[in-house]
Amino acid sequence: MAKKKSEEHSGADANDSDYQEEPNFEDPPGFVDNISDEDLLGDMLAQRPSEADGVESVVVVDNIPKVEPERLDKLKLVINKLFSNYGDIVNVVYPVDEDGKTKGYAFMEYKQASQAEEAVKKLNNHRLDKNHTFAVNLFTDFQKYENIPEKWEPPTVQTFKVQSDLYNFINDPDTYDQYCVAAETAPNCVQVGFWQNVLPEPFELETRERFTDTFVKWSPLGTYVVTFHKPGVAIWGGSSFQKIQKFPHPGTQFVEFSPCENYLVTYGPTPTGQKIIIWDIRTGAEKRSFVADGMSVLSMFRWSHDDKFVARMGENSIHIYETPSFFLLDLKSIKIPGIRGFSWSPTDNVIAYWVEEQNQIPARVTLMEIPKKREIRNKNLFHVADCKLHWQKSGDYLCVKVDRYSKLKKDKKDLDVKFLGMFYNFEIFHMREKEIPVDSVEIRELILAFAWEPIGNKFSIIHGEQNSSNVSFYEVNKGVKPSLVKRLEKKSCTHLFWSPRGQFIVMANLTMGTFEFVDSTNDYIISASPDHFRASEVEWDPTGRYVVTGVSSWKVKEDTGFNMYTFQGRIIKRTILKNFVQFLWRPRPPTLLGEEKQKEIKKNLKKYYAAFEQKDRLRLTRASKELLEKRSQLRETFMEYRNKRIAEWADQKSRRIMLRGHVDTDNLETDEVDEEIVEFLVKEEVTLLE
């Protein structure tokens, strides 16, 4: 109880009016407080030590093999190697029975609790072998499960969100294609516009400000468009491009869709290398993640055409994972000593890989059938410096470009290998023929580019000197060696772009911005040779009707924009866009019509010509009428503005006269103006005539 001042200062004046007795804060006798300590001091009580303190960094591993004492050391080595990838392990306990045999579980203590949480996240449900799959939990989880309430409460019902039609873009009756145009409006701020390529002028579908930080990318079938942000990436779709799913992966620099759009792979840097995460697109769940040592090459994963398998190359091996479990195929990698590269067939579950020369053993190209892992074709190659694998889009052919040498020189000091007398071979595998025969084409000049015709049996190459190269076209037929059908000499092109439908090809020089359009069925005649200075990209639309060339601000800062051409090279649209960075046609899914139905339509195509031509005429007439109406409206708007300004100018006449010394300068006669011509000598030259 607080003491009174009168007691503390006995000599004080009791009648002092400024003196007041201090309040008494003690509870009266028998008082019962109805406020609990948790309500009153909850924030402080939350910090008090608990029984779980000290075990937050302990994990419990169930379903480990039960082994005898003589095999325990080997088991510890395997499990410790696996769990030490996620932190420093300070203590491990393997309980054993009376006979010294392990009981099938173990306790592991990490140095930090965060390391234990990461181990649980990554190794729970990890499959050690066909009989043992880990169940990994934090030690503190047992307390959580003990405190489960006895009375069950049903979960809250979440309202169903109706998702818009993701495939409405292919329902257009006139089958107009869509495209997106990206322009950087500020650092890390890119505006993206979506357009429909309607004739005679494209129609704007949607424009999004600050849609992405860097660039956008379409999914293989055109269902989604992906955007990049600091926290991760997001995919959008539907008629108004709504957000469908987001994937948290900070610093993502590159993404890759599986061919059937079931999975998304994100690549992002870490302080020690690069982290790769595979996501389920529909659920947004993380299926599996990998940490690569060093900055690995982007797109290190290769998908099978049907999304059933995904593969990556390791040291002297290929790792093939099955979906949707993402476990290794048959729980083990395929050992291939000396492997240097591999690629999936675009239409079949067949992997092509090549092995370098080793100890007098020749290099080898192998075709392997998955999941049987059966080698269906081998081809030995000698004096090989490098190989590149090129599949034709239809999967009918595989071309292996082989860089060969005549002489090998090794430097004893730095162990560098120099290849002398280089020449090149094209090994053509006929995938649809019995026993897969292989043809060879030898080229003695430097190969600058190679491209298959997507639908057809031709391929083209650029060879020779860079400033004056030749373009050769070869045709591949059953039972005969590939034949040279045309050579275009002295062409300064650097890239080849076939139409998605075949037949037409663009030979491009992306250094100078020059292009040549070639028809491969009409004696390879060059139909047009347009220029687009500093153009750095070429994009065919999915139907092969239009080609776009673009000048990106990633390369230059002035005159950025894009041009649109017909497949014959006729310019139909020029667009100058400040800070233009990207143009992408929206891909189309494959047709649902069978081959017989497609053949029937092609056979009877002439029947539809009249209807198509009439529709085109009506469209052009409607467009002309709309253009005239638009011009008339613009003229009326201008005349209205002009008359308004004339009236305003007339109202200000008195003010002008006053400012100009009471002289009406509006009606001065031109006769009062004197015109004087003055001539003067500028230069004098003297010429002597002999």
Curated annotation (Swiss-Prot):
Alphabetical list of InterPro entries matching this protein: EIF3B, eIF3B_RRM, Nucleotide-bd_a/b_plait_sf, RBD_domain_sf, RRM_dom, TIF_beta_prop-like, WD40/YVTN_repeat-like_dom_sf
Domain named RRM: residues: 57-141
UniProt GO molecular function: RNA binding; translation initiation factor activity; translation initiation factor binding
Database matches in Gene3D superfamilies: 3.30.70.330, YVTN repeat-like/Quinoprotein amine dehydrogenase (2.130.10.10)
Pfam family, one: RRM_1
Positions with biased composition (Acidic residues): 15-25
Segments for region (Disordered): 1-36
SUPFAM superfamilies (alphabetical): RNA-binding domain, RBD (SSF54928), Tricorn protease domain 2 (SSF69322)
Principal localisation: cytoplasm
Sections of the chain in a coiled coil: 595-645
Transferase is among the record's keywords: no
Highest taxon, organism lineage: Eukaryota
Compositionally skewed regions (Basic and acidic residues) per UniProt: 1-11
Record's subcellular location: Cytoplasm
Cellular component GO terms held in the UniProt record: eukaryotic 43S preinitiation complex; eukaryotic 48S preinitiation complex; eukaryotic translation initiation factor 3 complex
GO biological process, one term: formation of cytoplasmic translation initiation complex
Disulfide bonds: none
Annotated keywords: Coiled coil, Cytoplasm, Initiation factor, Protein biosynthesis, Repeat, RNA-binding, WD repeat
WD repeat residue intervals: 207-246, 293-331, 334-369, 442-484, 530-575
Function statement: RNA-binding component of the eukaryotic translation initiation factor 3 (eIF-3) complex, which is involved in protein synthesis of a specialized repertoire of mRNAs and, together with other initiation factors, stimulates binding of mRNA and methionyl-tRNAi to the 40S ribosome. The eIF-3 complex specifically targets and initiates translation of a subset of mRNAs involved in cell proliferation.
UniProt record similarity statement: Belongs to the eIF-3 subunit B family.
Subunit field text: Component of the eukaryotic translation initiation factor 3 (eIF-3) complex. The eIF-3 complex interacts with pix. Interacts with mxt.
PANTHER family noted in UniProt: EUKARYOTIC TRANSLATION INITIATION FACTOR 3 EIF3 -RELATED (PTHR14068), EUKARYOTIC TRANSLATION INITIATION FACTOR 3 SUBUNIT B (PTHR14068:SF0)
Official protein name in the record: Eukaryotic translation initiation factor 3 subunit B
Organism: Drosophila erecta (Fruit fly)
